[in-house]
UniProtKB/Swiss-Prot annotation:
The keyword Glycoprotein does not apply. It comes from the Bacteria. This is UPF0208 membrane protein PBPRA2797. Belongs to the UPF0208 family. The lineage of its organism: Bacteria, Pseudomonadati, Pseudomonadota, Gammaproteobacteria, Vibrionales. It is found in: Cell inner membrane. The keyword Hydrolase does not apply. It comes from Photobacterium profundum (strain SS9). The chain crosses the membrane at residues 41-60, 65-87. NCBIfam families: PRK01816.1. Its main location: membrane. It holds the Pfam family DUF412. It is a multi-pass membrane protein. GO terms for cellular component: plasma membrane. Keywords: Cell inner membrane, Cell membrane, Membrane, Transmembrane, Transmembrane helix.
C-alpha cells in the first residue's frame, strides 16, 4: 500500500468535490452533498471570520484577547481543510458490497446503452461511484434511472 500525504488527501478531496453529482436524489443516501456544500461555504466565509476575529480585537484595543482571537482565526481557517480532508479520504475508501453491486449495475446500464466507459473496477471506490453516477445522470434518461432513484 502506498503512503499518501495530507496534501494528496486535499487534492483528492477537491477532485471528488468536482466529480460528485449534486443531485437531490443522492442527498438522502450519501452525506457527500452536505460535506461539499459545507466545504464550499467554509471556503468562502471562514477567511472573513478569521480576519474579523483578529481585527475586532485590535479595533477595540483589546490586545489581551488577541491570542484567543488568533486561535479562533486558526480554527476558522482550518474548517475548509477539514472538509477537503474528509472528502479526500472518502474518495479513496472502497465501496461496501451493497454499493459495489449498485456501482456495477449502473456501470452495466451505461455500457449497455452504448456509452464508452473506463474499465470496470474490481474494488470500486467512492470516486469511481461518483464518476459512474455523474455519467448516469448526464447520459441516461429518467426512465433508465427510475430503478435506482
Amino acid at each position: 500500500m502506498t503512503q499518501r500525504t495530507v496534501w494528496q488527501d486535499f487534492q483528492n478531496g477537491q477532485q471528488y468535490m468536482a466529480t460528485w453529482p449534486m443531485r437531490k436524489e443522492l442527498a438522502a443516501i450519501f452525506p457527500e452533498q452536505r460535506y461539499i456544500k459545507a466545504t464550499k461555504f467554509a471556503t468562502r466565509v471562514m477567511p472573513a471570520v478569521a480576519v474579523m476575529s483578529v481585527l475586532s480585537q485590535m479595533a477595540f484595543n483589546n490586545y489581551g484577547a488577541l491570542p484567543q482571537a488568533m486561535t479562533v482565526a486558526l480554527f476558522a481557517l482550518t474548517m475548509p481543510l477539514q472538509g477537503l480532508w474528509w472528502l479526500g479520504k472518502r474518495s479513496r475508501t472502497t465501496l461496501p458490497p451493497s454499493l459495489a453491486i449498485w456501482y456495477r449495475e449502473i456501470y452495466e446500464k451505461i455500457t449497455s446503452e452504448g456509452h464508452a466507459m473506463q474499465p470496470l473496477k474490481k474494488q470500486p471506490r467512492y470516486l469511481e461511484l461518483a464518476e459512474v453516477l455523474n455519467r448516469a445522470f448526464k447520459q441516461l434518461d429518467k426512465t433508465s434511472l427510475e430503478r435506482w432513484f
